[in-house]
């Protein structure tokens, strides 16, 4: 039942915010705060209560891949919805779900706080759309029925379209339509793949269902599997986004209001990575294995292209948007490396990118509200005018380039080490992208905040509300940088189940022999990442499943 509340609380708060906002805009804002903070508090409580379960070694609930998936669940609910078509209201939660749900509610709350003074028209309707988006995103991350997943996947497009089109900037309608068309067209390809998988499984087994656990291991030809995998990949590649289907993202970010950019960067594009990890790879492991090299090429292109394009921007917000293209290239690289270190790095990257890039979008939005421009040619020396803003911007710029000691460094380090195990050339080229990240991050600071102030700007520094938001994000990035173990332990069972269920395809194979000698202890793939606590220290990936782990992973052997 608790899983339903994660969807129902923001969904119920949405019309409340709209109605209350018609009388008093302040009530709409506070309703939105409650609608995002309440499920976040509920989730944190569940996370703390489930600490022992998350630390335990993975135990499959049944035979095969489905048993491995179910073994990592913390909670689930499944009731018939459209029974004649085999559609169930099927929600489940594991460590991966906890992480992405926390991002959804946390970034949703930040989006509301960041818009506290910036949104002055149709305030109630605005917060209705934000809460609708949050509820739909929660549904996406909890769904284990592919039809239900697609339902929520499409449902979130509508409120985000209105957020951009109604409250965006000069070219907001163009950006909103482009965002909608890209996502809708690619989503239809995924729908075709889902329906095809439904009929293939039904004809083979007599069980027509959209249930994810039943569809695992569906028998089909390699050509069919590859084509269906491409249908899923198209939808998730657009969301991530992957070059060359990324062009909607800079426009959407540039024209969206601050809240829209925070949700886009912090949560919405993470659906692409989540969908690949949760559905695409487990359903079509051999096809993904065959597609590994082209995908890694696209990932490396995205890393370098996004960084180079960021360097060439005059618009500060568009620069930050292109950094997301580069950072998500690392995510794609880690997904197709598909080993413990890479996958744990991907999950850390999703979190740290959400915090650092979300903070930069809040910073840019606040700056635009003060000086009414995003053109860096009209900036320079702003640190002298607003030193707290300048220092905060420097911190998040350093986080974005992967400064050691911050969470982004740990994430990229794990991804590159994991990638090296399967593809040395991809790891080397991906590491080269970090050099470009340094260039665009420091160039941004030089053009906007350093140098002499020659334009006569005079504006207020960060407010207490802004300082509070940035302080929370800074603390989170520093904490993850020095002690990422809570996140690693939270996701270790999910990573273990994913790696084991795809092992037969060779996707999760290591360069070393994977079969232990007779009488040796079984290897727990998830335990490998337990030695990565600290700022990237320790990368052993051969740890006994019997290793004793202190609360939330403190002290592996």
Region roles according to the model:
Residues 1-2, 16-128, 204, 209, ...:
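Transmembrane helix-loop-helix hairpins at membrane boundaries of multipass inner-membrane proteins
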Residues 4-19, 33-46, 101-115, 133-134, ...:
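Central hydrophobic cores of alpha-helical transmembrane segments in multi-pass inner-membrane proteins
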Residues 22-39, 119-132, 144-150, 168-189, ...:
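Membrane-interfacial loop-to-helix junctions in multi-pass inner-membrane proteins
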Residues 50-88, 188-246, 276-294, 342, ...:
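Juxtamembrane/interfacial segments at transmembrane-helix boundaries in multi-pass membrane proteins
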Residues 92, 138-144, 277-291, 331-351, ...:
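Helix-coil boundary and interhelical linker segments in multi-pass alpha-helical membrane proteins
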